[in-house]
Amino acid sequence: ACKNRYLKWVVGGDNGTQYSRCPTPATCNLVADVYHSTPAVIGNPSEGLRDEGYQRFASSNARKRPLVLYTSTNDGFLHAFKVASNDPADSNDAAAKVLTKASNELWAFIPPAVLPKIPSEYPNVHQLLLDGAPIVRDVPGSTPSAAGATIKLERNLKSIGTSESDWRTVLVQSFGSAAPGYFALDVTDPVAGPKFLWQLI
């Protein structure tokens, strides 16, 4: 029962207690404070690299990815907000549409290392749980031919310029002043959501 109340509190639901992050729709505030986490704004791949694999990657993502702002908040979440569409046709797509009077949040992610610390802020204690600045880069890799195999963020001479050559957009962030350590997400398709890659603590 306590676990369920806590989970409802984290996402802003009515947890049946006097403590709520959304007392009323007009006073709902699920985004905590941003302190040292300088936002990163990322759109289409734009690096002019003379690499066949990268050119395929840039072409396949051209005018597809919305402009996304990444920042973390001290309640332990990394947030992804859609700030602009790169394709006018996206205005007909509910997932890609940017609303001027809404948060336009695509998703929020809690690194595994932060999860055990979140109960310390319940019901209303300010903590520095995630305070680093995200860095986003396009990273070369190779896709093994086996079905269901994971992408390796590394390359060798054999894979360059072949069908195994692949690129991903990867976000790496430290935990900042909250704790030592780093985590990484694959944010190649921000609308579909992030893929957790690793964490170092």
Regions found by a protein language model. Name each.
Residues 1-201:
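A fold-level detector for beta-propeller and closely related beta-sheet-rich head/sensor domains
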